[in-house]
Amino acid sequence: MIGYYVHHQGRGHCSRATAVAGHIGTDVVALTSASLTAPVFSEVITLERDDSDPQPRDVDAGGLLHWAPRHDGGLRTRMAQLAEFVETRRPAAVVVDVSVEVTLFLRLMGVPVIVTAQPGVRDDLPHQLAYRAADAIIAPWPAELYQPDWLREHLPKTVFTGGISRFDGRLPVSHPTFAADILVVTGAGGVPGAPHPATTLGEELPEHTVVGLGPAFGTWVDDPWPFLCSARVTVIGAGQGSVADAAAAGRPAVVIPEDRPFAEQRATGTTLARSELALVTSSWPSTERWRSILDTAGSSSPEWSRWHTAGAAERAARAIEAVAHR
């Protein structure tokens, strides 16, 4: 049996874990504080939250960790749950997506750990401790497009899988019912209730069809695949899941990186722009700029195959199984 720790922020970690777990040839138990129900997991253990204290103290343990608030009851219960899982279930390995503290805690209990890396600036001590402790590192992007300096020390145990999309293997579904000139997809990892400039874009471009999907528009759908395949242009942030899904659909994309810890999305945006896979902009385009984007969208054929989404989840699963079988 393999454990799979899934971070609760947003939906990207859950989608990635679900995609990978579906290719693992043994029971996989999810450990998470997120709302996660997926048949690929033999069990989901709900972990206590460790971020409910409005005034957490000494959260980084003097710079050694990222999140270990002093005397936090939620953290204490959470770690006790993980310890009980290891003691009673004896996992062959645990995947951590993502947490420095969980990685180190599990390794201290003698459990082989596979860590999912994220883009950005990860040269700080906590990240490097986790990467050194890991038995393997999964980098869910193409090796030829992004190899940050902070990862070079760990390359011998790093598997670059390509972008992991929940839609890998699905046939394109293009239909007028789902068509839009501009499809704006927002994730669940940002600021809840924050206004989105796309809400007025339809009024500014009455000659075009603008569709918004996500919490910012109150129009979340579980399966945006037909929308992604049918759009002339898709607008996304630079989260790993969003980029992988856009790559799987193969449509032209406008990528607007959002502010995230460790400059995660900025790094991905820079990679996409340098590789000419998407139009990357740091701010919301003007109305005239949108018209220009749409005028050129028809002749745009991004080489999304370079993001290597085909088979990425399966490659991650094989790397996980290799550690579990040692």
Q: Locations of the language-model features?
A:
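A short, glycine/small-residue-rich beta-strand->loop->alpha-helix junction that serves as a flexible
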Residues: 5-18, 124, 192
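Conserved nucleotide-sugar phosphate-binding/catalytic loop shared by glycosyltransferases and other
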Residues: 7-8, 26-75
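Short amphipathic alpha-helix
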Residues: 13-24, 36
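Donor-nucleotide binding loops and adjacent catalytic segments primarily
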Residues: 21, 166-233
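Conserved nucleotide-sugar donor-binding subdomain of glycosyltransferases
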Residues: 62-93, 98-103
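A donor-sugar binding/catalytic signature common to diverse glycosyltransferases
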Residues: 93-98, 224-267
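A nucleotide-sugar donor-handling region in carbohydrate enzymes
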Residues: 133-192
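C-terminal amphipathic helix plus adjacent low-complexity
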Residues: 291-326
